[in-house]
Amino acid sequence: MKLILLIIAAYLLGSIPTGLWIGKYFYGKNLRDYGSGNMGTTNTFRVLGPKAGLLTFTVDFLKGTLATLLPMWLGVTHISPLLFGFFAILGHTFPIFANFKGGKAVATSAGILLGFAPFYLIFLLFIFFFTLYLTSMISLSSVIAASIAIITVLIFPALHFLLKDYDFLFVLIVISAGSLIIIRHRENLVRIKNKTESLVPFGLNITKQKTH
């Protein structure tokens, strides 16, 4: 029973539509009606500004971390904490509190890694921010970091680099979350191809997108 309750709690925690609620209750704006219509960090940053964007990222990030750590704090050790983190990702992507139309799972997935493999997270964050500096695009940085995660989660354990051993559930969740992130960015990839993707106000914009 405790296991079922924790899975439900992880899903409900992930379902909290941070950006949507911040926009509605503090800015009087429905993010669905602005920008890309997404309630994640990128659109929140673009529509509501850096403070709201940073707050959205932080809360969405911590949803993944809390969902991963809470079972361990409650003494549930016979099940991998990653299972609960995965349900937080599902909640974030398909939130019951927002008509099952959620974010792209980047921040929440990163939060899970903080609770389970922090040094691996640092590696992926380096990839993300380095790509962000080169391209000025959060979307492309997210896709590249997700792609690198899918590749390295299969390679690093064999090299005993950052990931000591193969954990089947960890590999499965990283591949699943990474694939979900890439799929959720399909429209962004089309805009990148057309050179019309939105940019952050810094970086080199090496792909020469036309919008700022």
Swiss-Prot record:
It comes from the Bacteria. One of its GO terms (biological process) is phospholipid biosynthetic process. Pathway: Lipid metabolism; phospholipid metabolism. It is an enzyme of class 2 (transferase). HAMAP family: PlsY. Belongs to the PlsY family. Probably interacts with PlsX. This is Glycerol-3-phosphate acyltransferase. The gene is plsY.
